[in-house]
Amino acid sequence: MKVLIIGSGAREHAMAWAVARSSKVSTVFVAPGNGGTATMGGKVRNTPVKATDIDALLELVAKESIGLTVVGPEQPLEAGIVNRFREAGFKVVGPTAEAAQLETSKVFAKEFMKRHGIPTAGYEVFRDYASAKAFLETCPTFPQVIKASGLCAGKGVVVAMSRDEALEAIHEFFESRIFGDAADEVVIEAFLSGQEASVFALTDGQNYQLFLSAQDHKRIGEGDTGKNTGGMGAYAPAPLVTPEVMRRVEEEVIRPTLAGMRADGYAYTGFLYVGLMIDKGVPSVVEYNARLGDPETQVVLPMLKSDLFDALLASVEGGLEVVPFEMQEGAAATVVMASAGYPDAYETGKVITIDPTVNDMEGVLVFHAGTRRDGDALVTSGGRVLSVTACAGSLKEALDRVYRAVDAIEFEGAYCRRDIGAKAL
């Protein structure tokens, strides 16, 4: 079968790599893909169609007789790509625009959790500056967490440690409009203490299969300092998510979420990412995402021993509960190599040199994000450039392998965090 992966990041490179391993897959199209998917060869090829150009994607699927489409990023989900593909009779992995509101509207998600008794922080919703300001001026405790309701590429959250910081944040959201329409509604919620981890499921709306848990590193600086990013590294499994914690997550979060979505008339299909805060073994939901995370995908997919394609197809056709879904023993880690200046302004077009020894390093995979081909050269084209992954028998060994590979890759101004996974060692 021919498969289409929509997106251009390291997440989509990892998906293309995983799907191409299946003997049942003949060709993997990546739209638009990146410099890494362009040079994978074998079954994988890029096609120059934007991830948000739904009409052109529908044309591509019809023309190439593509049997299954997998949506990587959130923007096409919000735009209703799954609805359009289903109306046209095409098989697609992902939630409808209505179901994807679990990610695309923080207000929808919080109200959904409250309605269905899913553990999450207490919250208030505001639709204008004056009411949010009045609330914060009388708010007795800080920190408070301030979130733009809409999509902000993972950057629309401020943990305000003081009243002044909180007031500044809502001014930026409502008055300076730094996130535009995405901050027309703002959620202010209680700060949850604990450690964050993520759990990922693939679901047909009723049945589900679980990937390994993971922890990512959102901040740009070591020691989790500085600005939020799309994610600077990750590892799996997360030691924090013990079998007992995972049992609670299934019982208190995943099953009630799927049942609640069915009850509300928005059966949820595709990937479900649950961002959790875990405090003394008790999980609370920080956020939902309607797709796999980036960089977490780059650690959870390499740890999947079974055929990903079989599971993806079953999530659309049925039979997901009986599909093999086995994980490897050991651990995986990924480190993001970013452009100088990221997450603020950065330059692109820097030549990337990957030492040939990297190809022979045991357990190492280099997934591309902000890269493109420029003639024979590979050059940078984004803030997050590469996601260097390694699998091994232990997290320590995986991290050793990753950093060995990172040290064999060069581009001007390359930056990475050197403490990925340190708190789990």
From Swiss-Prot:
Catalytic activity: 5-phospho-beta-D-ribosylamine + glycine + ATP = N(1)-(5-phospho-beta-D-ribosyl)glycinamide + ADP + phosphate + H(+)
EC id: 6.3.4.13
GO molecular function: ATP binding; metal ion binding; phosphoribosylamine-glycine ligase activity
Domain ATP-grasp: 110-317
Cofactor: Mg(2+); Mn(2+)
Pathway: Purine metabolism; IMP biosynthesis via de novo pathway; N(1)-(5-phospho-D-ribosyl)glycinamide from 5-phospho-alpha-D-ribose 1-diphosphate: step 2/2
Range of residues in the leader sequence: none
Alphabetical UniProt keywords: ATP-binding, Ligase, Magnesium, Manganese, Metal-binding, Nucleotide-binding, Purine biosynthesis
Annotated ATP binding sites: 137-198
Enzyme class: ligase
NCBIfam families assigned to the protein according to its UniProt record, in alphabetical order: purD
Protein name: Phosphoribosylamine--glycine ligase
Organism whose genome encodes this protein: Chlorobaculum tepidum (strain ATCC 49652 / DSM 12025 / NBRC 103806 / TLS) (Chlorobium tepidum)
Encoding gene (name): purD
